């Protein structure tokens, strides 16, 4: 989450990280990011939404991510609340897939962390065609397509992502 927040800040998109982990807080602050030591599920969570327009839940806890999305869905709307897929959602194909899943149907916390450790910086790729975009979205064993930035707008990629190259 720190590398994503750092990328967004670099492109003038304000972020605030919420965490209780002293190590995560220290790492975020050393990267120059705004971070709050606070439980996002606490009752005073509504005060945290004053300047926010999206929630991206990227904790190692599936339960925290799911509950945070449920809590903030009514505030931000279902198009602005995202979380990682759970291992059970990957394994049990019979489960209906929620639409708030980030990145892809198989990008869980473990895959995200393994790729971030291997490649700590986000790589920006210029898209020059529809075919190139589809290939990037569909062939992602060694990377996770995270977002599309066009001018001053950022779209996070989720399982129901539809974007047409223009």
Q: What residue spans do the PLM features occupy?
A:
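Cytosolic regulatory regions of ion transport systems
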Residues: 1-166
